[in-house]
Amino acid sequence: MKASKELLQKRLYKSNQVLNANSPFVITDEILEHHYHAFQEPWGEGEKVILQKEDIMQYSKEESKAIWNQNAEFWDCAMGDESNDFHREVVRPKVTELLNPDPTDYILDIACGNGNYSAYLAEKAVSVLAFDYSEKMVELAKKRQKRYADHIEFCVADATNETSLMALKRNKPFTKAVSNMAVMDITDIKPLFTSVYKLLEDNGVFVFATQHPCFVTLTEKYMTPHSYYDIAIEGQPQKQCYYHRSLQDIFNLCFDTGFVIDGFYEECYFNKEIPDIIIVRAIKIEK
């Protein structure tokens, strides 16, 4: 017998796969049908719900890019100039605290979306190079943020391709780099971390926020990197690709690349005892 939506909501507390401005954690019937198989087992006088992920597959960056191009207009409208409540209340404050932007900075904005965080930095007189691998998203970002053209340069680049990333190098190194909720959307993050290290000045700062792999990815295969389809904002045209990695995979990649982590937050939204995201500050050190 299928478990009810109410039982799953009680069991899970939240689903961070559905985010909108006013109701960030909603388990929809579509998600239940598409993503989870629920089985009943005896549990005293009640019921116990066991969740299992659907078939684990590796979705390609080409599939992911096509989906983001299809979702771009919806995403631009949904995030707007100021982003949604989740980003404004949970992501942005600690990201900005760790990034500590200054007018003297030259910041790389990774997977910039419609550019609203780049605009936030530009308001602080920061110079920004912002990129995304969705051509449609970059087109919309340029249009939406055209009033900041003197502070923001928008580019199309592939975060999984070191050659594409190193083409972002300009006459001066970046002082800082930032990624707001994008690491979980990227097929292979090793080229990104390697390139960011090379593009940053000595002692440069890399701040990234991503889904908390312990509490958000609803899977029994925590230690195994894998990918799956889900939605980020309710009503988006296409489900996007997510890429799960354990904390040790993420942290060890930082260390192996040459970064030292000197700032870390676990931030909550719906349930104040269950963090939805991690925010990491990594400092480039000489190898």
Regions found by a protein language model. Name each.
Residues 175-189:
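A short SAM/SAH-binding and catalytic strip from SAM-dependent methyltransferases
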Residues 50-102, 116, 120, 140, 207-233, ...:
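Conserved class I S-adenosyl-L-methionine
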Residues 257-259, 267, 272-287:
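Core SAM-dependent methyltransferase catalytic element
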Residues 165-177:
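A short acidic, Gly/Pro-enriched loop at the edge of an enzyme's catalytic core
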Residues 190-205:
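A short glycine-rich, Lys/Arg-flanked "PGG" loop and its adjoining helix->strand segment in the class I
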Residues 106-163:
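Class I SAM-dependent methyltransferase SAM/SAH-binding core
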Residues 241-264:
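Short alpha-helix
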